Amino acid sequence: MAYRESFYRYLMTQRDADSSDEIAQFANNAQHDLTFPKQEQDYEKLSDYLELNASYLPSMYIFDRAYRMYEDKMMY
């Protein structure tokens, strides 16, 4: 079985403090979320966590887009 990095680790590659991009802002804010499930890969578990705890995420659509990008990267 091939190694698959966590969603958090992927998300951290999207950080950019100078960007107004929604995914970059999500990544910037997630970096400061001390309880973010950093080892998680599962969409449902991440989605549940964010819906309940991530007041910094204005729309779950942003997470959905970021997760699709993560899945695309993990295919290669």
UniProtKB/Swiss-Prot annotation:
Stored SUPFAM superfamilies: YozE-like
Pfam entry (one): YozE_SAM_like
Record-linked HAMAP family: UPF0346
NCBIfam families per UniProt: PRK13672.1 (NF010193)
UniProt family annotation: Belongs to the UPF0346 family.
Protein name (database record): UPF0346 protein lhv_1069
Organism (species): Lactobacillus helveticus (strain DPC 4571)
Record lineage: Bacteria, Bacillati, Bacillota, Bacilli, Lactobacillales
